[in-house]
Amino acid sequence: GKAVAAEDICFTTVEDATRFVKETQVDMLAVSVGTVHGLYTGKAQIQHARLKAISEATGVPLVLHGGTGVSDEDMRLAVTEGINKVNVGTEMNVQWVDRCKSTFEKGKVNDSVRKFLIPANQAVTAVLMEKMALFK
Protein backbone atom coordinates (compact mmCIF):
# COMPACT_ATOMS: atom_id res chain seq x y z
CA GLY A 1 0.00 0.00 0.00
CA LYS A 2 0.89 3.63 -0.31
CA ALA A 3 1.43 5.84 2.73
CA VAL A 4 -0.81 8.90 2.89
CA ALA A 5 -0.22 11.91 5.12
CA ALA A 6 -2.97 12.43 7.70
CA GLU A 7 -3.74 15.89 6.34
CA ASP A 8 -4.37 14.42 2.88
CA ILE A 9 -7.02 11.94 4.00
CA CYS A 10 -10.51 12.81 2.84
CA PHE A 11 -13.10 11.84 5.43
CA THR A 12 -16.81 11.40 4.79
CA THR A 13 -18.79 14.34 6.15
CA VAL A 14 -22.29 14.06 7.57
CA GLU A 15 -23.49 16.48 4.90
CA ASP A 16 -21.98 14.52 2.00
CA ALA A 17 -23.26 11.21 3.35
CA THR A 18 -26.78 12.56 3.86
CA ARG A 19 -26.90 14.11 0.40
CA PHE A 20 -25.54 10.97 -1.27
CA VAL A 21 -28.02 8.68 0.49
CA LYS A 22 -30.92 10.99 -0.39
CA GLU A 23 -29.91 11.30 -4.05
CA THR A 24 -29.08 7.64 -4.67
CA GLN A 25 -31.29 5.72 -2.23
CA VAL A 26 -28.41 3.29 -1.58
CA ASP A 27 -28.99 0.23 0.59
CA MET A 28 -25.62 0.61 2.35
CA LEU A 29 -22.98 3.31 2.47
CA ALA A 30 -19.20 2.86 2.69
CA VAL A 31 -17.72 5.66 4.76
CA SER A 32 -14.23 7.05 5.25
CA VAL A 33 -13.77 7.43 9.00
CA GLY A 34 -10.09 6.63 9.53
CA THR A 35 -9.34 3.23 8.04
CA VAL A 36 -7.36 2.39 4.92
CA HIS A 37 -6.99 -0.63 2.66
CA GLY A 38 -3.99 -2.89 3.20
CA LEU A 39 -1.65 -3.42 6.12
CA TYR A 40 -1.24 -0.68 8.71
CA THR A 41 2.10 0.71 9.74
CA GLY A 42 0.48 2.11 12.88
CA LYS A 43 -2.87 1.92 14.67
CA ALA A 44 -6.11 2.67 12.84
CA GLN A 45 -7.66 5.89 14.14
CA ILE A 46 -11.40 5.49 13.66
CA GLN A 47 -13.26 8.74 14.15
CA HIS A 48 -16.09 7.32 16.25
CA ALA A 49 -17.99 10.58 16.71
CA ARG A 50 -18.03 11.11 12.93
CA LEU A 51 -19.17 7.52 12.36
CA LYS A 52 -22.01 7.79 14.87
CA ALA A 53 -23.16 11.14 13.46
CA ILE A 54 -23.22 9.76 9.89
CA SER A 55 -25.18 6.72 11.03
CA GLU A 56 -27.74 8.82 12.87
CA ALA A 57 -28.12 11.28 9.99
CA THR A 58 -28.43 8.74 7.17
CA GLY A 59 -30.26 5.85 8.80
CA VAL A 60 -28.68 3.32 6.41
CA PRO A 61 -26.35 0.45 7.29
CA LEU A 62 -22.72 1.53 7.00
CA VAL A 63 -19.73 -0.30 5.52
CA LEU A 64 -16.17 -0.10 6.82
CA HIS A 65 -13.49 -0.70 4.18
CA GLY A 66 -9.98 -1.33 5.44
CA GLY A 67 -11.01 -3.34 8.50
CA THR A 68 -7.73 -5.26 8.59
CA GLY A 69 -5.72 -4.09 11.57
CA VAL A 70 -8.63 -2.45 13.39
CA SER A 71 -8.60 -3.57 17.02
CA ASP A 72 -11.43 -5.76 18.29
CA GLU A 73 -12.37 -3.01 20.75
CA ASP A 74 -12.64 -0.40 17.98
CA MET A 75 -14.55 -2.85 15.79
CA ARG A 76 -17.10 -3.62 18.53
CA LEU A 77 -17.61 0.08 19.10
CA ALA A 78 -17.95 0.77 15.37
CA VAL A 79 -20.66 -1.89 15.18
CA THR A 80 -22.65 -0.07 17.88
CA GLU A 81 -22.22 3.14 15.87
CA GLY A 82 -23.78 1.84 12.66
CA ILE A 83 -21.24 -0.40 10.93
CA ASN A 84 -22.99 -3.45 9.46
CA LYS A 85 -20.35 -4.76 7.06
CA VAL A 86 -16.57 -4.82 7.38
CA ASN A 87 -14.02 -5.62 4.68
CA VAL A 88 -10.99 -7.53 5.95
CA GLY A 89 -9.61 -8.88 2.68
CA THR A 90 -5.99 -8.13 3.47
CA GLU A 91 -6.17 -10.05 6.74
CA MET A 92 -7.73 -13.02 4.97
CA ASN A 93 -5.07 -12.94 2.24
CA VAL A 94 -2.23 -12.77 4.76
CA GLN A 95 -3.61 -15.73 6.73
CA TRP A 96 -4.18 -17.77 3.56
CA VAL A 97 -0.70 -17.16 2.15
CA ASP A 98 1.04 -17.71 5.50
CA ARG A 99 -0.75 -21.03 6.00
CA CYS A 100 0.02 -22.13 2.44
CA LYS A 101 3.70 -21.30 2.93
CA SER A 102 3.98 -23.27 6.16
CA THR A 103 2.05 -26.22 4.73
CA PHE A 104 4.05 -26.28 1.49
CA GLU A 105 7.31 -26.34 3.47
CA LYS A 106 6.18 -29.56 5.20
CA GLY A 107 4.75 -31.19 2.08
CA LYS A 108 6.16 -33.43 -0.59
CA VAL A 109 6.25 -32.80 -4.33
CA ASN A 110 3.68 -35.50 -5.05
CA ASP A 111 1.21 -34.45 -2.30
CA SER A 112 -2.31 -33.54 -3.36
CA VAL A 113 -2.88 -29.81 -3.68
CA ARG A 114 -5.83 -30.24 -1.29
CA LYS A 115 -3.32 -30.99 1.46
CA PHE A 116 -2.07 -27.43 1.06
CA LEU A 117 -5.26 -25.54 0.28
CA ILE A 118 -7.58 -26.97 2.92
CA PRO A 119 -5.51 -25.66 5.88
CA ALA A 120 -5.24 -22.27 4.17
CA ASN A 121 -9.01 -22.12 3.71
CA GLN A 122 -9.47 -23.15 7.35
CA ALA A 123 -7.22 -20.26 8.43
CA VAL A 124 -9.40 -17.81 6.49
CA THR A 125 -12.53 -19.34 8.01
CA ALA A 126 -11.07 -18.82 11.49
CA VAL A 127 -10.43 -15.12 10.76
CA LEU A 128 -13.96 -14.66 9.47
CA MET A 129 -15.49 -16.41 12.48
CA GLU A 130 -13.53 -14.14 14.83
CA LYS A 131 -14.71 -11.03 12.96
CA MET A 132 -18.32 -12.22 12.84
CA ALA A 133 -18.28 -12.72 16.61
CA LEU A 134 -17.61 -8.98 17.00
CA PHE A 135 -21.10 -8.30 15.59
CA LYS A 136 -22.89 -10.21 18.37
Regions found by a protein language model. Give the residues of each.
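Extended, intrinsically disordered, low-complexity segments
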Residues: K101-K136
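Short, ordered loop/turn segments at secondary-structure junctions
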Residues: G34-V36, G67, E91-N93
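Alpha/beta enzyme core
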Residues: G1-T58, D72-E81, V86-V88, D98-S102, ...
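Short beta-strand/loop segments at the ligand-binding rim of alpha/beta enzyme cores
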Residues: E56-G66
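Catalytic cores of large soluble enzymes that bind and process phosphate-bearing ligands
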Residues: I9, V88, M92, F116-A123
